[in-house]
Structures are given as C-alpha cells and as structure tokens.
C-alpha cells in the first residue's frame, strides 16, 4: 500500500470517528429545560404565537416553533398556557430596616415571599430607602434576595416612613446622585413621595438628582394645591421618561368634577411622561380608570405598590392588577407588555422583560381562566370580569422558583426520595 493511500485511509477513518462523536454528542440532551407548546408573548421580539422555549445554563437558548424534546433533560408541557418574560413590578416596598429609627413605619414585605407566586422575577423598591440608608438596604435586602431587587432612591436621605417626607432639609440631590452613580447595578432612578408643600423642593431635587445621574424620576405626588397641581407638574417640572405613578388614583384631579379625564393627563403624555398604575391601598379607582379608558388613555405600565396595607385589599398581587386591566378592556398582549417590556424600558434595563436568546431565563408561565370574576378597586367597588390570570410557574435564572401544579415535577410514585433520618424505619432506630 502506498504512503498516500495509507494517509487517505487514516484520514477517512479519523473523519468517520469524528462524525460518530459529533452524532453521539448531538443525540445527548443539551438543554436543561424545554417549555413545550406554550403561547409565547414577547413584545420586544414581536412574538404572539405558539413557540417552544429552550433553556440552558440559566439563559434562554432558543425560541422556535418546534424543538425536539429529546434535546432537553426536562420537558414541561405548556400547551394551553402563556409563556412570557418574567414580570416586572416597578412599584413595591420591600425594605425592612435592620435598625429602624424610633417611630419609623414599616409596611414593607419580604420580596421572595410575594414575587414568584405572581410570576414576578424583578421588583423595584419605590423609595423606601434614601441615600443615608441605601447601604443597609443593599446588604440586607438586595443581596440575599432570590428575586432581582432594584430601587428608586428616595430623594429624602432617611427614606420613606421615617417622618421626613416633608423635610426639605433632608432632600440632597448631590448626595442622592452620588449614591446612584456608586450603585448603578441596583439604582434605576429617584423617588419623590408624599410631599405636601409648600413649593416644589421634593420634585425639584429629585429631578436635579436625575439630571446629575442621568436617571428617571418616579413621582408619588403629594397634596395638590392651587399652586401645586398636575398641570404644572407635567408641563414645567417633569422630563420625558419620568414616571407618574398612581395614575388612576383620583387624588390629584386626574379626572375633573364632570367625570371627564383631566386634559393635563393628555398633555403630559404628549411630553412623554410615563403613566404607571401603582394600585396600592388607596390609589386605584374605577371612577377614574373607566373615564380614562373611554377617552383612549391607557396606562404605560402596571405595578402594585405592594406593601402590608395593600396586599389584602383590591390590589392583592401583580397578576390580579393585570386581570383588572383586562377587565377595563386592554387585550392580553398589551397587558403582558405593560408588565414586562414596557417597565423594562422605563427603568432602562433592556436586558429584562424579553426572551432574547442569551437573556437570563426569567420566565412566567401563566394561565388565563375564563368565567365570571369580580375585580375590586381601592374602595372595594366591584367590576365584573370574564378573565383572570393565574401563575402556573415562574423561572428565575432558569430554575423553577414557583410551580403551582407541579408541571416540572415527577409523580410521587416514580419520584426518588432521598431518605434521611426522618424516613428511618422503627427497626433502624
């Protein structure tokens, strides 16, 4: 046999072995999890159709009409369910101080206790901490939480609930901006809250901090007066991209005495002010929301204002607020967008709120129940609805964080129990 023929023969054998290795590797499951046959709603990627979603290494690996189940180690049947990016709630209160000052009010909740069961993977604490106590908030709340916790930093240095909401001496734009620049991974903007006057120091300092740090401001507008009104707020004070939360509260003349929508709301939208729900304990009423919808004025984003005084009233949780927006007439894709891609853009986190390939696999699997339901506003007034959103499963970084009906679990009869001391028989004791 000639040398050239021998080399050729060896090359062909090597190629054959290589092909076998590649074939064997391709036959092995390489996705960690496959969500099969769910209806994907992803506003960023303009998907509103049945798709399979594959997850690998905690990230979205593929979104396609058909993915072979043999490629995944675990397959979840999502047929009849909606698969969306993990929900984003940009108005919550989750800061329990490690050393609260005397007389401080504490209405915050544990983020992990109320996020995943509602499909929420990211929350934004809306001003519970200020520049003076942000380090405590970061160390004791943000770091240990499994939920992604971000923050609007209160322009009041001592934060919310400490009795300083109306103390202009506590409002330091430079200090707030400095803390924001030092913590860009957590702080997404500034919060002005509950200020009752006189003047505009809370708004002005929050906006100044926003300009210094290049970040938006969220406003929970306090007491209105002849001088302090939403006309001035929207036309003279806030910037495009700033957020007016509690947009259907009625406390700031969002509707007029004749029941019609205040034209200032429309003018604010023209200036690209963001209008956020912020349901809360006393900030969402049908008598405001219905005229707004009749005028074609819809919210930009849906949030809860989650705290101990709101969670058991009309608000309940984010998917309940989303169900209320369905009852008002918004179609499901819009409602999903208002709780995913829209808030992600508002807080300038484009890596969130979508199912981009390579994105962290924060995912909600939702069921839309059909029937006769009642949605309550903050006064307890009821509006009938025919659809209600239920969270079946939540994934955080590709790991199951909530599974209402065990979609990702084995049947107990085939489940391999790891029997520890608790399972020892009497004979072994």
Predicted features by range, described:
Residues 38, 360-414:
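C-terminal cap of metal-dependent C-N hydrolases
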Residues 287-370:
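His/Asp/Glu-enriched, well-ordered alpha-helical/loop segment
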Residues 189-312:
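Active-site core of metal-dependent hydrolases
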Residues 29-33, 40-86:
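Histidine-rich, glycine-flanked metal-binding segment
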Residues 109-194:
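Divalent-metal coordination cores built from histidine and acidic residues
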Residues 69, 73, 77-143:
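Metal-associated gating/positioning segment near the N- to mid-region
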Residues 22-24:
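N-terminal signal peptide c-region/cleavage motif recognized by signal peptidases
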Residues 38, 58, 80, 91, ...:
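Divalent metal-coordination and catalytic microenvironments
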């Amino acid at each position: 046999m000639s040398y050239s023929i021998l080399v050729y023969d060896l090359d062909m054998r090597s190629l054959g072995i290589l092909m076998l290795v590649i074939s064997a590797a391709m036959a092995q499951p390489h996705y960690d999890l496959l969500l099969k046959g769910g209806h994907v709603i992803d506003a960023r990627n303009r998907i509103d159709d049945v798709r399979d979603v594959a997850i690998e290494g905690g990230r979205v690996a593929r979104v396609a009409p058909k993915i072979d189940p043999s490629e995944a180690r675990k397959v979840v049947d999502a047929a009849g369910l909606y698969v969306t990016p993990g929900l984003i709630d940009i108005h919550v209160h989750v800061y329990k101080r490690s050393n609260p000052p005397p007389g401080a009010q504490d209405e915050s909740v544990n983020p992990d206790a109320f996020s995943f069961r509602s499909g929420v993977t990211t929350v934004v604490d809306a001003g519970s901490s200020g520049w003076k106590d942000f380090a405590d908030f970061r160390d004791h709340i943000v770091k240990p939480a499994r939920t992604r916790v971000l923050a609007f930093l209160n322009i009041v240095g001592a934060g919310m609930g400490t009795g300083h909401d109306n103390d202009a001496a506590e409002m330091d734009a430079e200090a707030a901006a400095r803390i924001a620049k030092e913590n860009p991974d957590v702080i997404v903007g500034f919060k002005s809250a509950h200020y009752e006057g006189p003047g505009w120091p809370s708004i002005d300092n929050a906006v100044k901090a926003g300009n210094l740090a290049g970040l938006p401001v969220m406003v929970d507008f306090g007491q209105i007066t002849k001088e302090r009104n939403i006309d001035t707020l929207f036309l003279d004070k806030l910037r495009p991209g700033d957020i007016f939360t509690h947009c259907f509260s009625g406390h700031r003349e969002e509707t007029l005495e004749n029941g019609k929508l205040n034209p200032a709301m429309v003018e604010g939208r023209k200036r690209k002010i963001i209008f956020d729900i912020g349901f809360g304990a006393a900030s969402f009423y049908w008598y405001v929301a219905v005229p707004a919808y009749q005028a074609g004025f819809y919210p930009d984003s849906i949030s809860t204002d989650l705290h101990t005084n709101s969670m058991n009233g009309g608000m309940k949780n984010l998917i309940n607020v989303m169900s209320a927006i369905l009852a008002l007439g918004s179609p499901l894709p819009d409602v999903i967008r208002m709780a995913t891609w829209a808030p992600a853009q508002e807080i300038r986190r484009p890596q969130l709120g979508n199912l981009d390939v390579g994105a962290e696999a924060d995912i909600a699997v939702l069921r839309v129940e059909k029937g006769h339901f009642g949605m309550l506003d903050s006064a307890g007034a009821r509006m009938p609805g025919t659809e209600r959103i239920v969270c079946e499963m939540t994934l955080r970084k590709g790991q199951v964080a909530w599974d209402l009906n065990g979609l990702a679990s084995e049947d107990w009869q085939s489940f391999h129990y790891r029997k520890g001391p608790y399972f020892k028989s009497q004979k072994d004791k």
